[in-house]
Amino acid sequence: MTDSIQDLLSIKLARAIANPLFPEVDSQLRSGKHIGQEYLDNYSFLADFQHELDSFYRRYNVELIRAPEGFFYLRPKATTLIARSVLSELEMLVGKVLCYLYLSPERLAQQGIFTVQEVHDELINLADETKLLKAINLRAGGSDLDKQKLAEKVRSAISRLRRLGMIHAVGDQHSGKFTISESVFRFGAEVRSGDDPLEAQLRLIREGEAATAQSLQEEKNGLKDNMDQSAVENEQYFENEENEGIA
């Protein structure tokens, strides 16, 4: 019996589960949170026991992934035994905008701090506002009330992404200010932190996943179509990870 238990539970895995950090880290991962280096203790714990914990989670038909940028998250398979949720189209679009802002020169100029309003404005610039409003309400006609509802949905999307560890609030929780985590690269897997930021930004623009004021002026109609397509491509990106969204 002892040998059988040891086959299933290695000494190092037993140490990981017995670690005081395990309950918190396990709960965060199961909720879909991405754990990066900013969570020093939890990140170090995952780095130390990555192999053992990956074997542990595979019994639930999920994988413990360490992205090229370093952050950890659980990727469910189609037969996962752990409850999961999928991001909405708007939440995915907001994630794309956050990835774009992370790469933009403005991040350095603003000491890495952005506001909810900036994300909202960038989303309106990059996407067709009419289609965004229709996504919120099919009968939306562009009234002030419709635009207010869209703004509320954007705030809700940002809150959801914050709970997933993709942004971090700065100052008072009602200030609307935050910094962006590298985990937003789940919305732009083709761009990696080793790339030159300006080159990565240009590539995003060419592929219809971001834009500048100049590119919007030059390719306004085409860009709108590309942003619509980028939402579909983003869904396919998550579906390619065992046909699922973020856990």
Swiss-Prot record:
Tagged with keyword Cytoplasm: yes
Localization terms from the record: Cytoplasm, Nucleoid
Signal peptide from the UniProt entry: none
Cellular component, GO annotation: cytoplasm; nucleoid
Gene3D superfamilies found in the cross-reference section: 1.10.10.2250, MukE-like family, C-terminal domain (1.10.10.2260)
Main location per the UniProt record: cytoplasm
Bias-annotated ranges (Acidic residues): 236-247
InterPro entries hit by this protein: MukE_C, MukE_N, Scp_MukE
Domain of life (superkingdom): Bacteria
Renumbered residue ranges of the record's region Disordered: 213-247
Biased amino acid composition, Basic and acidic residues: 217-227
Role of this protein: Involved in chromosome condensation, segregation and cell cycle progression. May participate in facilitating chromosome segregation by condensation DNA from both sides of a centrally located replisome during cell division. Probably acts via its interaction with MukB and MukF.
Family: Belongs to the MukE family.
Protein name: Chromosome partition protein MukE
Organism: Histophilus somni (strain 2336)
Organism ancestry: Bacteria, Pseudomonadati, Pseudomonadota, Gammaproteobacteria, Pasteurellales
Gene it is expressed from: mukE
